[in-house]
Structures are given as structure tokens and as C-alpha cells.
Amino acid sequence: MIKRLFCSINKNKIINEPPKLSIIKDTIYNLSSGVGKSGVAIIRVSGPQAETVIRKLIKKSDVDKNEEIKSRYATLSTFYNPKTNEQLDKGMFIWFPSPNSFTGEDVVEFHIHGGRAVIYETMEAIGLIEGTRPSEQGEFTKRAFENGKMDLTQVEGLSDLLDASTSFQKKIALKQMQGSISEFYLSLRKDLIRASAYMEAFIDFGDDAELDPEIVDQSRNRIISIRDKIQQHLNDGKRGERLRDGANIAIVGPPNAGKSSLINLLTNRKASIVSPIAGTTRDIVEVILDIDGYPVIIGDTAGLRNSTNDQIEIEGIEMAKDRFNNSDIKLFLFDSFNLFSQLNQNQNLNSSFNFNEEIKNLFNFIDNETIIIFNKSDLLKQFDNLKEWENLKLNLLDNIKKSNNLNSIQSIEISCNNNENIKDLLNLLKLNLKNLFEIQDKESPLLTRLRYKQHLSDCVESLDRYLYYCEHDVVLASEELRSAILSISEITHSVNIDDLLDIIFKDFCIGK
């Protein structure tokens, strides 16, 4: 009955063990250290012929034919071509017999000098041994997964660790590779399996006098708690995706406000063209930065203005608007000197400030994720009435808050010309990035991949249907519960019908 119900969830999805390779004929080898000249290079060999490779490349005097090779021991040896007997190099090898190795197979690592010729000739010599071949991309890790040394989330964590360019990325990837995400999802899966076991027992053995008639309600309450936990995990605000790909920061504002100068200053190189000619930046110029360990993609955009007939510039402005709206943090630059000069010329400074339509149109782009930057503060020193400038700033910020219904707004005054307050701006960015990446629930790992979110969303939908069917049809409710188990199991690729059977036999003593 139980097996029949499991198979009825989806004819194309039968819960089963992940495929494992019992016999792998090929022994694979490749360079595990970085490509190029180096002091030491490491060549990894994995598979049934790994021990043969050792004995073929060394002389009998180093390791006797009948002598057992010491495992996890660095053995100094001279390596030779097995066909020509020509010396290849003098180095070390470390032997990792199955199953206590990275791949779960017999593995040997040759530590040799990192010259190109040494690496090439050693690889060529290994390839002469029958049953060996160069590995495909990621094949060592694939074998580790297939042999149960890593689950899918740990494999992805290893991939993220290799790609990590900031300390925060490295920290999260390392935790994932060591099983933090696996533990979290396997714990949820275990709770779902236990609740499902109660439901299955009630359906199949409901007439048994020893079964508590409230078992369905107990299972339902347990599922509500699990569902809420998963939903809370889903509401992580895209922190995990930002961690892997980088937080998007857009620099926007009117032409010649100093956007390109700012990005050049932040990157310490000439990433954007700096010119007094309005409309110089047409495309979005993106630069990847590490700000206090947080990965950031910062983009310089076209100046926002209405008075242009240049079709290319108009398209660039539209791209700037789109980038601004889809950014995690927005830096909006005003040209302090130009802004104050216009008001000095056009109105009595003792009256209230009236902003023209062009400036007011810029207000629409500002929201809670925006930092308003008043650039070119060094040029304001030529004015005598700087108190009026302070009034102007307050008036401007107040207008923006009222126009966009904002409770508060972040602002700072800088000069890209003499680096005034640039450190303060960086500190403000660090604070915003910290809030952006902050993990609210310390027990809940970050959702670093879209597929996790999809499987969890499918799981929540199944649990919602389960809660509905609990009131109408317990058999259908049970099927939805098993569908939820399947969805969450696909994250780690750990799907096993025996887990459910073990719970049933353990908790309900069916055979007595």
C-alpha cells in the first residue's frame, strides 16, 4: 500500500536512491593545482589503477612490489617514464586508499616541480598506463558526489568557494561545502518524513486500537510549523543570490554631476571616461568591487536629462533608469556647484527655494535604498553665503521626502576632486551592504541558488495543498506531503523510500 501510494505521486518521479557507480573502469588524472609555472604542481589520480600508477612511476627500491604503500604519508621518490625509463622528476606522492579519499576511490597525488615540461612529461607518462585517461571538467568532484562523499549542495558550495573573490563569499561558501545547507534541508526533510509516516500509518492501520485518533491533527500542526519555517527561509530578500553574483549599485544623476569621476575614484583606476561634455557616458560601465568583504557590481550610467535629441544618449538614459530601478543600492549624485549657482542667479535667496521641473523629475528616482551625494563641495568655498547652501540642501531633501513619501533619507557631501569625505561615503556604503547581506535567522542558511528557491517554493505549495486536503481527504493529503518531501529532497539529491519505512517500523511496531 505504502509503495503504491509513493509511486502514485508522479508517474515520472518515483522516489529512489540516487545513482551510484559501483564500478568505474577508467582511472582519471589531471593537474589539480593552478595552470602555469609554479614552485610545486599537484597531479591527482583517481580510480582502480591509482596504485598501479604509483608502482609504474617509481623504482622498486622506493617501494617493494609486495610492500604495502603507506597511506596519508608523504613519500619522497624519483619518478620515471614507465616506457622509456627516463627520469621525470624527484618529488613526493601521497596515497589515499578507498574509501577515505576525496572521490571515495583510490587516489594518489603526485607533488612535483611546477615547470611546464615536468608537468607535461609526468602527465604523458601517466597516460601510458593502461586504463588511465585525462579527467573531464569537474569529474573528480562528480565522482565524489556519485560515491556519496558530497551531496549536491556541498558540490555547489565547493564551486562557489573556488569562485569566491571576497572574504564574505568565501565564508559562506566554506560553510556550505562543509554541510551547513545540507544539515538544514535534511533536518526539514526528516521532520516531513516523520509527519508523513504518521499519516501513512493512520491510513493503513487506522483501525488499530493502539493508534491515537488525533494523529492527523498532530501531523497537521507539525506541518504548519515546518511550512512557516520554510516560508521564512524563502523570505531572505535575495541575500544569497546577491552574495554569489554581487550587490548591484547604480550611480545615477544629471550630466556632469561627477558619476564617472566617482566610479574611477572607487575603483582606483580609469574605468569611465571623464569629460566636461554632457552625455559622455552612453552605455552602462560596470566594475566589480570588494567593499569590506562584500561583493559589489557598481555601474556608471548615462546622465539623466530631458533636453537631448541624441537617440543613442536617449537610449542610454533609458538603460540608466532601468538599472537604477533594479539596483540594490542607488547613489544619486547632484552637482552642488551647478545647483547652487543656478539658484544664486535665478531667485532671491531669502525666499523659499523653488526647484525647476528638470530637477523635480529627478526626485522620482529616489527611494529608501538611495544615498544622495552632493558632489563638488570644494567648489562651493568660493561663495560667501554657504548658510544658504545648507538651507538649500535641507529644502531639497525635504522636497524629496515629501514627493516620495519617505520617512528618512541618506545624504552626504563629497568632492571627487580632492577626495573630501570619500572615506565617510565608503563607511556609509559598508553599513548599507551589511544591512543588505545581514542574515536575520542565524539557523537559516542563505539561499545561494535559484534552484533551491524553486524546490522550496514547490515544497510550500505541496504543504499548502496538504493542509487543505487534511480537512477533506487524508489520502490526497498524504500524497501532497510526499510530494513536498520529494521537492526538498531534490535540493540535496537525497531521496530514499526506506527512510519512510524505517520511521513506520520504529514508531509503530507494525509487526507485533
Swiss-Prot record:
Span of domain TrmE-type G: 246-434
Biological process per Gene Ontology, one example term: tRNA wobble uridine modification
Location in or out of the cell: Mitochondrion
Keyword Cell cycle listed: no
GO MF annotation list: GTP binding; GTPase activity
Swiss-Prot/TrEMBL keywords: GTP-binding, Mitochondrion, Nucleotide-binding, Transit peptide, tRNA processing
GO cellular component: cytoplasm; mitochondrion
UniProt keyword annotation of GTP-binding present: yes
Principal location: mitochondrion
Binding site for GTP: 253-260, 300-304, 375-378
Superkingdom of the organism of origin: Eukaryota
InterPro entries associated with the record: G_TrmE, GTP-bd, GTP-bd_TrmE_N, GTPase_MnmE, MnmE_dom2, MnmE_helical, P-loop_NTPase, Small_GTP-bd
Entries under Pfam families matching the protein: MMR_HSR1, MnmE_helical, TrmE_N
PANTHER family registered for this protein in UniProt: TRNA MODIFICATION GTPASE GTPBP3, TRNA MODIFICATION GTPASE GTPBP3, MITOCHONDRIAL
Function text: GTPase involved in the 5-carboxymethylaminomethyl modification (mnm(5)s(2)U34) of the wobble uridine base in mitochondrial tRNAs.
Family label: Belongs to the TRAFAC class TrmE-Era-EngA-EngB-Septin-like GTPase superfamily. TrmE GTPase family.
Protein name: tRNA modification GTPase gtpbp3, mitochondrial
Source organism of the structure: Dictyostelium discoideum (Social amoeba)
